């Protein structure tokens, strides 16, 4: 059964199309990563599903409630990027108490759940720290804790791994997987972190210019890649003529008397190594924009 149903969704900003999504559905326990370049409409999409922003046309139903109704906030919680929206000069604990009060709850009612979240996200050292002194990643944790205390059926996350270190990402991934698998929570997540998306997603949606242009499992869209890297190789610019003869189709740049070329194919990298003296070399992770460009243009 599809618990999120979107039909003929449209949103414009100043006459420009921000969203144009004819159809989208999601079901309990699904983790959907929404990826795309900046300005693709990712954040706008989850804000509309959560009821924080309203569409110009179309319908959004979440567990039977329209996103325009007050009931939507009982089912959906949105965690914004960088943990914004808290009282800077209250502690983390004081902010938690305040938001519990807004939701007509109290610490005594959620004592066990709160302790469990503190443990899973290693949050105990920060409970009495002012929010103004928390790092971006720790604010993200606070945002997630407050959202989950409301026991949402749908959790919308906007770039949730920004500011998180490797250990925090693993804690975060484990928690989201537990929510989806044991409680059936739907997680809709915008992200530029392709490796995090690979680890936890049941489905990937690629957005471009306000449209969902491709969706499927991670392997269906990105193949079996485990890393996306390119090689930056430098040789002496005195070897320019020889390089152009051997590799006429490769472009390059000249920097500080070095000829710099970028390649992604390891065999091509080895061919360059075998034919020239290498004076500079590094592996560089590709950006999400570069990865998506390759995926979209391979279709």
Q: What do these predicted regions represent?
A:
Residues 50:
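Helix-to-loop junction immediately C-terminal to a conserved catalytic motif
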Residues 58-74:
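Conserved ABC transporter NBD signature motif
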Residues 97, 101, 109-126:
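Conserved ABC ATPase "signature" region
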Residues 130-134:
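Conserved ABC ATPase signature
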Residues 155-159:
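Catalytic Walker B motif of ABC-type/P-loop ATPase nucleotide-binding domains
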Residues 175-260:
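ABC transporter nucleotide-binding domain
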Residues 263-299:
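C-terminal coupling/interaction segments
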């Amino acid at each position: 059964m599809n618990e999120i149903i979107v039909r003929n969704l449209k949103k414009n900003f100043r006459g420009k199309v921000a969203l144009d999504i004819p159809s989208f559905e999601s079901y309990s326990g699904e983790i959907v990563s929404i990826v795309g370049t900046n300005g693709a409409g990712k954040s706008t999409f989850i804000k509309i599903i959560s009821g924080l922003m309203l569409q110009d046309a179309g319908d959004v139903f979440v567990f039977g409630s329209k996103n325009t109704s007050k009931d939507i906030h009982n089912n959906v919680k949105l965690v914004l990027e960088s943990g914004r929206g808290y009282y800077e000069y209250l502690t983390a604990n004081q902010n938690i108490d305040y938001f519990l009060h807004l939701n007509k709850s109290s610490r005594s009612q959620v004592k066990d759940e709160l302790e469990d979240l503190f443990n899973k996200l290693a949050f105990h050292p920060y409970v009495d720290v002012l929010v103004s002194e928390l790092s971006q990643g720790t604010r993200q944790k606070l945002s997630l804790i407050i959202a989950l205390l409301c026991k949402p059926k749908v959790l919308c996350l906007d770039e949730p791994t920004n500011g998180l270190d490797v250990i925090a990402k693993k804690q975060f991934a484990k928690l989201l997987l537990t929510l989806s698998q044991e409680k059936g929570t739907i997680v809709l997540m915008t992200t530029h972190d392709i490796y995090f998306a690979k680890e936890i997603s049941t489905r990937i949606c690629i957005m471009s210019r306000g449209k969902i242009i491709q969706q499927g499992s991670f392997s269906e869209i990105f193949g079996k890649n485990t890393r996306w890297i390119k090689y930056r190789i430098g040789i002496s610019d005195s070897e320019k003529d020889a390089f152009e003869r051997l590799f006429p189709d490769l472009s390059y740049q000249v920097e500080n008397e070095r000829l710099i070329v970028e390649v992604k194919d390891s065999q091509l990298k080895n061919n360059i190594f075998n034919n020239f003296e290498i004076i500079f070399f590094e592996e560089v992770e590709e950006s999400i924009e570069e990865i998506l460009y390759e995926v979209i243009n391979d279709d």
